[in-house]
Regions:
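C-terminal outer-membrane/trafficking sorting elements
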Residues: 462-515
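Edge beta-strand at a domain terminus
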Residues: 6-14, 24-28, 60-72, 105, ...
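Short, solvent-exposed loop/hinge segments that bridge or flank secondary-structure elements
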Residues: 14-40, 91-94, 151-182
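Extended, low-complexity, turn-rich repeat/linker tracts enriched in Gly/Pro/Ser/Thr and Asp/Glu
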Residues: 50-52, 274-284, 296-299
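Beta-rich interaction/scaffold domains
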Residues: 378-465
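Beta-sheet ligand-binding and adhesion/scaffold domains
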Residues: 76-133, 227-239
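Aromatic (Trp/Tyr/Phe) and Gly/Pro-enriched flexible surface segments
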Residues: 130-265, 269, 283-294, 298-331, ...
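Predominantly extracellular/secreted and cell-surface proteins with exposed
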Residues: 26-28, 32-105
């Protein structure tokens, strides 16, 4: 997808059209203009397609006054209204057409769904522009390609394995050519017909550890690329999974060694079945990680004495115990707070799964079966806060994601400036309206799939249904005691490339390298 930036942004990308169940795929342009009032205008000009050989010249779809809601990373555009579609062959029938539009503006990327109801033609047209990118491609491990590793000494000496499309292991690794060949010669990835209970798919992935005599090679898969650079498996400066969106290398399937993700999921779910080849009490666990980052170079694990400042959030479980012959679904929550100080924006995610949480410490024949990995996006209500003129903060009692309506008596005037709804979705979009003693909160999940509406009935008087808390400014005091340059100068935030010393409120000190 490309965007031309000026007074407006024009995006070129795939356009999927569904007309009463019949589909058409083509490429088109959509233009997004920001209005002076902060709303947006969407233009899909000269919209036409061929339906069963019959040309359909619909016309110009121009949607004005589309409200935008930010989640701090991206913008949601959402509106439901009637519009006139002009410039086509059916202007007289399309003077007032109901449309339901929801979309997301990302950094150089746009995605939207537009439902167009043409009642006079008895047609419902569903238009999808762009790519959703809220889930990983081939996360069910249904399709595979052949990965090949070649001896650096003899181009005719090769080994192959089945790697899941969009995923990678040792045969497609970077690093020392000789070590890549040694690590990749014996396959560790296998397509498998043993699927998790209730799956609609036919395949899963099996990872298998291999005894290389000098060390155990853990069965490992990643959305990025493996690097094999040292005989010592635990040398994280040389052996790691990595991704970098500026890298143009492609795998045997023609895909890059990175996964795009602009969103902020709340958890990663994955079905696993884990069996050790030989019981190992000191190193008994498999591992699964997902690290959201800004798309610049990132290694997992990080090199020694390095802290990455391009991380947005992570989901990590390094204690996946044996499940025997049983499939088990794991839910691994994402955490974001520890990385907020870096101010990075989500563009990519590096997901890695391995038969052992410790490099080279597994046993020969460890098996990790993987199926149906997904990201979870919440859209529930977690809290409602109201702030008095003196800074005292109140929370509405009993708020939870299931209860949709609340009532509170408040001893001060409630406005849009002192009323806030907090979602249980990290990247959820929250829009608030407040009029005539009723506040309405519409919460949409970051993947745009779920919307919940909550209401708060507000009365003026002595406090009822609310609880006073501490002053908001005190509650939000920084957890970091100080950030210093290597020269000892204190700074407010890590903004420029360089080495920093970070001291937390408990006196702990760490070095942080911003590239």
């Amino acid at each position: 997808m490309t965007a031309l930036t000026g007074m407006a942004d024009t995006y070129n990308g795939p356009l999927h059209i569904d007309i009463n169940g019949t589909t058409v795929d083509q490429t088109s342009d959509i233009t997004i203009e920001k209005q002076a009032d902060g709303n947006y205008t969407l233009k899909l000009m000269k919209f036409k397609f061929s339906l069963k050989g019959v040309p359909m010249n619909v016309g110009n779809i121009i949607i004005t006054d589309v409200p935008a809601v930010s989640n701090g990373q991206t913008l949601m555009l959402k509106v439901k209204k009637n519009i006139a579609i002009k410039g086509g062959s059916m202007d007289l029938m399309l003077k007032s057409v109901p449309i339901d539009m929801i979309g997301e503006l990302r950094d150089g990327d746009f995605y939207t769904n537009i439902d167009i109801i043409m009642e006079k033609l008895n047609q419902k047209i569903k238009v999808t522009f762009g790519t959703a990118k809220y889930q990983l491609p081939n996360a069910g491990f249904e399709t595979y390609h052949t990965a090949t590793v070649t001896s650096p000494d003899d181009p005719n000496e090769k080994s192959t394995s089945d790697e899941p499309d969009y995923w990678h292991s040792f045969m497609s690794a970077s690093g020392n050519p000789g070590l890549v060949y040694m690590a990749g010669y014996n396959p560790v990835t296998f397509k498998c017909d043993d699927v998790r209970p209730g799956s609609t798919g036919k395949q899963s992935l099996m990872l298998k550890s291999i005894d290389m005599y000098i060390a155990i090679a853990n069965g490992t898969i990643t959305t990025g690329r493996m690097n094999t650079g040292d005989f010592t498996a635990s040398n994280t400066d040389a052996n790691y999974a990595w991704s970098d969106m500026s890298n143009t290398d492609k795998d045997a399937h023609g895909d890059p060694f990175y996964a795009t993700l602009y969103s902020l999921p709340d958890a990663m779910k994955v079905w696993l079945k884990f069996k050790q080849g030989t019981a190992n009490a000191e190193h008994p666990y498999a591992t699964a990680t997902a690290i959201i980052n800004d798309g610049t170079e990132f290694h997992e694990p990080a090199p020694s004495e390095t802290t990455y400042t391009n991380v947005v959030g992570e989901a990590r479980n390094a204690k996946i115990a044996e499940t025997g012959d049983e499939w088990k679904e794991f839910t691994i929550p994402f955490t974001y707070d520890a990385f907020a100080q870096y101010g990075a924006k989500a563009k990519s995610v590096l997901v890695t799964l391995s038969t052992n949480a410790d490099a080279g410490k597994g046993s020969d024949g460890d098996l990790l079966y993987v199926d149906d990995l997904s990201f979870v996006y919440n859209a529930g209500l977690k809290a409602i806060t109201l702030t008095a003129e003196n800074g005292e903060m109140f929370t509405v009692d009993g708020v939870n994601s299931e209860t949709k309506e609340y009532t509170a008596t408040v001893p001060f005037d409630v406005t849009a400036n002192n009323l806030k709804a907090i979602s249980d979705g990290k990247g959820a979009y929250v829009s608030t309206t407040n009029a005539d003693g009723k506040a309405t909160f519409e919460i949409t999940s970051n993947d745009l799939a779920t919307t919940n509406v909550y209401t708060l009935n507000i009365k003026k008087g002595n406090a009822q249904g609310i609880t006073s808390g501490i002053n908001g400014a005190q509650a939000a005091q920084a957890q970091t005691a100080g950030i210093y340059t290597i020269d000892g100068m204190r700074v407010n935030a890590i903004t420029k490339p360089g080495l920093y010393i970070v001291k937390d409120a408990n006196g702990n000190v760490k070095k942080v390298l911003k590239k």
